[in-house]
């Protein structure tokens, strides 16, 4: 549950591309 949610999806994606999302998240 919560996979459709924006926060849950973002967290799951961040875990997969933690290194890639980390750079994007820090820039944001």
Curated annotation (Swiss-Prot):
One of its GO terms (cellular component) is ribonucleoprotein complex. Residues 1-28 are annotated as: Disordered. Residues 11-28 have a biased composition (Basic and acidic residues). The keyword Ubl conjugation does not apply. Keywords: Ribonucleoprotein, Ribosomal protein, RNA-binding, rRNA-binding. It comes from the Bacteria. One of its GO terms (molecular function) is rRNA binding. The keyword Ribosomal protein applies. Belongs to the universal ribosomal protein uS19 family. Protein S19 forms a complex with S13 that binds strongly to the 16S ribosomal RNA. This is Small ribosomal subunit protein uS19. It comes from Phytoplasma sp. (strain STRAWB1). The lineage of its organism: Bacteria, Bacillati, Mycoplasmatota, Mollicutes, Acholeplasmatales. The gene is rpsS.
């Amino acid at each position: 549950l919560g996979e459709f949610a924006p926060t849950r999806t973002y967290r799951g994606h961040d875990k997969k591309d933690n290194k890639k999302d980390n750079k994007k998240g820090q820039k944001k």
